[in-house]
Design a protein with these regions (language model features):
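Extended active-site neighborhood of metal-dependent phosphoesterases/phosphodiesterases
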Residues: 83-162, 166-170, 191-203, 213-225, ...
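Short loop/turn segments that connect beta-strands within beta-propeller blades
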Residues: 337-340, 377-380
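Beta-strand-rich domains and repeat architectures in extracellular enzymes and scaffolds
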Residues: 305-330
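A short C-terminal boundary segment appended to hydrolase-like catalytic domains
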Residues: 31, 244-312
Length: 420
């Protein structure tokens, strides 16, 4: 049956809203029935020798269980996020005889030699929105892209999440999925919780910590799930999640061995938590937010202007006189007036940009994950020439003695450098 076809990309938001409105009407006409889904996380394909076996055996175990309707994989599905790993993952996931929903985690994007382009290319999108038996499942991607830094949800994923949540009826039950737990370890956790708290979120699911744990995400019931890796155990495992009218139950499944008693129950539409022998949600009372009061300590430093982009800005900008040029992960090159921040010109490449532009007396040279080196007119932003390297470029360009230099990293046996 394969993967659910998710609602993807900003260009399709209007279609997504129409589809969700139809689904909401269906929800209003029928009561929710109980269902069960399998929840895998932190597969880390290509990490340990047994990681592939654990995933394949998990899929076999799920296929053989008639109670399971579909599967969620909540990130870190590979170890390094390179192209070979994603192609192997694609081949393994074809063994599912039931639908699955898939998200990237930090391991899938932090060290990507393909410039974080292959996950979307192979699996269609880094987020999903799907309705099942009167419950809406919403999941968004993780980051930071191409940076080994603190957990972060990319700006474009936040905007996508906000648009989907706004189009979701307030009474419609929602289960939210991300690779990261929604706490202060996530740099922009509060952006997510502020969005989710506007809707009827039953529970949030996360991986990342390789353990089963219940916690509270600013009043929203939240659960962290185990890794599918066996580690010191003889065989791997995952969670079986059953959604009922009045509760959501979490049971650990040991592959082809046993389903253990419920380790967590989220009570729905009730103030009481689970029974004393089953950990329930803890209720925090103080919700923290970033504190920028230090800015007032140094009055000599003041903000002249600022712009907020619709995607992440992953590299430093470049400045030449009164021209400031920066790039973003939507593949855009923006030239601004350095004095007031007003747009001078923009130029679109075909994929993400993680590199800083190089400015010469006449040109702005940019490398992009579309595989091209772009040389733009510095004054007008029009293309003067471009060169195809046939592979995503994440390295910054430099110009010396009339030559452009950059570097390419291939996972094939023949990496190459080129100077132009």
């Amino acid at each position: 049956m394969g993967k659910f076809k998710p609602i993807i990309i900003m260009k399709r938001i209007l279609l997504a809203i129409c589809m969700m409105a139809m689904s909401a009407l269906s929800y209003g006409q029928s009561n929710r029935v109980s269902f069960t889904f399998a929840w895998l996380s932190d597969v880390h394909l290509n990490s340990f020798a047994y990681a592939e076996d654990d995933l394949r055996q998990s899929i076999e175990d799920i296929n053989a269980n008639p109670a399971v309707d579909f599967t969620i994989l909540s990130g870190d599905v590979t170890e390094f996020g390179d192209t070979k790993e994603f192609l192997l993952l694609q081949e393994i996931l074809k063994n599912f005889r039931k639908p699955y929903l898939l998200l990237p985690g930090n391991h899938d994007v932090n060290w990507s030699e393909n410039g974080c382009t292959m996950f979307n290319k192979i699996f269609q999108a880094s987020h999903f929105c799907y309705d099942w038996q009167g419950v809406r499942f919403i999941g968004c991607g993780a980051g930071p892209s191409l940076r080994m830094g603190p957990p972060h949800i990319p700006r474009e994923e936040i905007l996508w999440l906000d648009s989907i949540v706004r189009a979701t009826p307030k009474e419609l039950p929602v289960i939210f999925v991300n690779h990261f737990p929604l706490n202060r370890d996530l740099s922009n956790w509060y952006e997510v919780t502020d969005i989710l708290k506007t809707r009827n979120v039953l529970v949030t699911l996360a991986g990342h910590l390789h353990t089963n744990r219940a916690y509270d995400a600013e009043g929203i019931p939240a659960v962290i799930g185990r890794s599918s890796l066996r580690r010191e155990d003889p065989i791997g495992g995952y969670n079986l999640v059953t959604v009922n009218e009045d509760s959501i139950t979490f049971c650990e499944r040991i592959i082809q061995t046993e389903t253990r008693p419920a380790w967590n129950v989220v009570r729905l539409n009730a103030t009481a938590i689970a029974s004393s022998n089953i950990p329930g949600e803890k209720k925090d009372t103080v919700y923290y937010r970033p504190d920028f009061s230090i800015n007032s300590t140094y009055p000599a430093v003041r903000e002249v202007w600022k712009q907020k982009d619709v995607t992440d800005v992953a590299s430093q900008g470049s400045i030449d006189g009164e021209l400031y040029i920066y790039t973003n992960t939507a593949g855009m090159v923006h030239a601004l007036n350095a004095r007031n921040g007003e747009t001078v010109w923009t130029y679109a490449t075909g994929n993400k940009i993680f590199s800083a532009p190089f400015i010469t007396s006449q040109l702005v040279v940019v490398t992009s994950c579309d595989g091209f080196i772009h040389a733009l007119d510095k004054k007008q932003g029009s293309a003067r020439w471009k060169f195809n390297t046939d592979y995503p470029i994440v390295a910054c360009p430099t110009v010396a003695n009339g030559n452009v230099y950059t570097c390419l990293l291939y996972t094939s046996p023949s990496p190459r450098d080129r100077s132009l």
